Amino acid sequence: MRSIFWDDGLKLIDQTKLPEKLEVIECRNVEELADAIKKLAVRGAPALEAAGAYGIALAAREREFADVDELKEHLKKAADFLASTRPTAVNLFVGIERALNAALKGESVEEVKELALREAEKLAEEDVERNRKMGEYGAELLEDGDVVLTYCNAGRLATVDWGTALGVVRSAVEQGKEIRVIACETRPLNQGSRLTCWELMEDGIDVTLITDSMVGIVMQKGMVDKVIVGADRIVRDAVFNKIGTYTVSVVAKHHNIPFYVAAPKATFDWERTAKDVVIEERPREELIFCGKRQIAPLNVKVYNPAFDPTPLENVTALITEYGVIYPPYEVNVPKVLKF
C-alpha cells in the first residue's frame, strides 16, 4: 500500500497510529490535509511533495466555484496555506508549485480540476520511479553482510512508496544481499522505533532498535559498516534532516564509517546555504509528554527544533536518482543534477 494516494479522494496512512494500528484516513478538504501534515500523519520530504500536489487537486474539488477565475484564486490561497504548514522540507513547496502551475493553465473549471489531479498523479508515479533508481545506485555501495545504521524514517512511509535510505536497503536485499539494519529510535516522536522498525519487519528485513544515545557505542564496537539517512533539504553547504542526524554524522566521521545521504533531486535547494533555512520548531508538549504520559515537569523550558544541518564535509556521498555524487559537491552536484 502506498503511503498517500488518490482513490475518489485523498487517502493516506495515518502514521501517528503506527505501529499499533494501520489506519487509512481521508482528507476531505485542504484544512484536513494541513492538519494531517502538521501533526505528522503524513511526513517525510517526498511524501510531503506528493501531499502538496494532491492538496492542490483537493482544493480544486472541495467546493463549487462560480467560474474558473474564482477557482484559480482559491488554488493560489490554498497553495500559500499548505506551504505554511512546515517551513523546512523543500519538497512540499515543489509539489505545491508543480500542481498549481499545471492547474493554472486550465481554461475551464473542469480542466483546472483535471490538470491538477493529473499532475499530482504524475508526480506520485515519478516518486516511486526515482526511489527505485536511487535504490539501485545506492545498493552498489552495500556489500553482502553489511550492517546499516539509519536515523528517523526514510522508507516507504516517508515517500509515496519504496523509500530513499530504506529503498537502498530494500534494493540490496532484492539483489540477494544479506543486509541488517540498526534503527535509532529518533526522539522525541520516535519515527525510528515506530515507523522504520515496523516497515522493515513487515518486509522481513533484520532490524535492531537502539536509543539515539547508543550510536557511539555501536560504532565503537564495530557493529556498523555504513550509515544511510534521508534528507528534508540539501543546500550548498549542509543536509537538513531530522534532529540528531548531525550528531550521528560526527560520530560516524570519528570512526571512519561511511555516511551516505539518499535524496531525490527535488530535495536539493542549491541556491541557498544553511543560514537561509528556517528550522521548524515543534510544540513543547512533544518533550513533556510521551503519548499521554507526562515525562517532564509541565513548566520546564523546552527547545524542540525538528531538524539540524549536517555539514556536507561529513557526508561521504549523496545517493540520487541520477547516480551517486561524491565530493567536491560544489562541482559535482550541479554537474550530475544539471542545475
Swiss-Prot record:
Pfam families cross-referenced by the UniProt entry: IF-2B
Domain of life: Archaea
EC number: 5.3.1.23
Keywords, sorted A to Z: Amino-acid biosynthesis, Isomerase, Methionine biosynthesis
TM stretches of this protein: none
Any Gene Ontology biological process: L-methionine salvage from methylthioadenosine
Listed InterPro entries: IF-2B-related (IPR000649), IF-M1Pi (IPR005251), IF_2B-like_C (IPR042529), Initiation_fac_2B_a/b/d (IPR011559), M1Pi_N (IPR027363), NagB/RpiA_transferase-like (IPR037171)
Annotated GO MF terms: S-methyl-5-thioribose-1-phosphate isomerase activity
Binding-site positions, substrate: 43-45, 86, 191, 241-242
Active site residues of this protein: 232
EC main group: isomerase
Residue numbers marked as site, Transition state stabilizer: 152
Classification via SUPFAM superfamilies: NagB/RpiA/CoA transferase-like
Catalytic activity: 5-(methylsulfanyl)-alpha-D-ribose 1-phosphate = 5-(methylsulfanyl)-D-ribulose 1-phosphate
General function of this protein: Catalyzes the interconversion of methylthioribose-1-phosphate (MTR-1-P) into methylthioribulose-1-phosphate (MTRu-1-P).
NCBIfam families from the UniProt entry: eIF-2B_rel, PRK05720.1, PRK06036.1, salvage_mtnA
Family recorded in the similarity comment: Belongs to the eIF-2B alpha/beta/delta subunits family. MtnA subfamily.
Protein name: Putative methylthioribose-1-phosphate isomerase
Organism: Archaeoglobus fulgidus (strain ATCC 49558 / DSM 4304 / JCM 9628 / NBRC 100126 / VC-16)
Upper lineage: Archaea, Methanobacteriati, Methanobacteriota, Archaeoglobi, Archaeoglobales
